[in-house]
């Protein structure tokens, strides 16, 4: 693993300034009530968890948080909404477009994660000034069906394609600790390497086993496994953050 970490660090230095980091702030603009059945997620309406369904945040509330984030040094503001897709939420989507425009007007980058998008919605987000869109694959194609069945792997790849075609940076990664094995972690990275362009960022998350979800009993992922996955991703996806 030491050799992998050394190689990963060397590759990273070839493509990025190792002395620079970007501070991002994430805000949940719509909590709970999601119709999806992602087995790890407290936001799903199918499980009894601590999350309570809420309405989409008002524009001004979001702008207050964005201003605070900028004052604290963040250069990117990310907004997440717990729902399956944007479709059918015209008023809510318009409010999100207004959020994107206003926050870009503050001089910040803006990222959203809003579930599935079609090509038109992706283009509207681009025109509003969206910098990046997060849509994780979660795990390998082979293991995916054991984590979620309400949305297909191809659905996720299609949204990523719409985002990329609109000229928005793609943020897409996965979660470790879902019960997958090493081959699934390799499979996830392999899927990313097959995209026409590598994602701008490849987040590697560790599962927080939340009571009430089907994965509440999963043990924490080991640090060495996390480190090995991050190192492998750096080597295979050298330009991704």
Q: What label would you give each PLM region?
A:
Residues 76, 81, 105-106, 154-213, ...:
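Conserved C-terminal portion of the radical SAM core fold
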Residues 45-78:
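Conserved alpha-helical substructure of the radical SAM core
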Residues 1-40:
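Flexible, acidic/Gly-rich N-terminal and inter-domain linker regions that tether
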Residues 28, 44, 82-84, 109, ...:
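Active-site beta-loop-alpha junctions enriched in small/polar residues
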Residues 38, 75-77, 93-175:
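Radical SAM/AdoMet-radical enzyme domain recognition
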Residues 24-28, 48-51, 78-91, 143-144, ...:
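Glycine-rich, proline-tolerant flexible connector loops at the mouths of alpha/beta enzymes
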